């Protein structure tokens, strides 16, 4: 479970990825955000969406993002440095 600092960091990063502010991250938004991390392919985006979008609705909800972030703390620390 995320502590208050970790939750605040998840909130901040989620808002960076959720460019249109609709409360969910689309594949397009994910791709745009990941371009900041370097070269990313369409297949990379599809693979990440499949992993993080656990309910399969085509979007990453805040809960799905938070669950992924909590399970991948090292990766999220790296992402936080960039965003």
Curated annotation (Swiss-Prot):
Which amino acid positions bind Ca(2+) 2, per UniProt?
53, 55, 57, 59, 64
Q: Is Calcium among the key words of this record?
A: yes
Gene3D superfamilies attached to this UniProt entry = EF-hand
Residue ranges of every copy of the EF-hand domain listed in the record = 5-40, 43-75
The domain of life for this entry's organism is Eukaryota
Q: Which GO terms describe its molecular function?
A: calcium ion binding; enzyme regulator activity
GO CC term (a single one): cytoplasm
Binding-site list for Ca(2+) 1:
18, 20, 22, 24, 29
Full protein name: Polcalcin Bra r 2
């Amino acid at each position: 479970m995320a502590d208050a600092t970790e939750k605040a960091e998840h909130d901040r990063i989620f808002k960076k990825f959720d460019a249109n502010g609709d409360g969910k991250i689309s594949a397009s938004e994910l791709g745009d955000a990941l371009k900041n991390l370097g070269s990313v392919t369409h297949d990379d985006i599809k693979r990440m969406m499949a992993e993080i979008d656990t309910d399969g609705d085509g979007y990453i909800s805040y809960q799905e993002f938070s669950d992924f972030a909590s399970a991948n703390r090292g990766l999220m620390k790296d992402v936080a440095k960039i965003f």
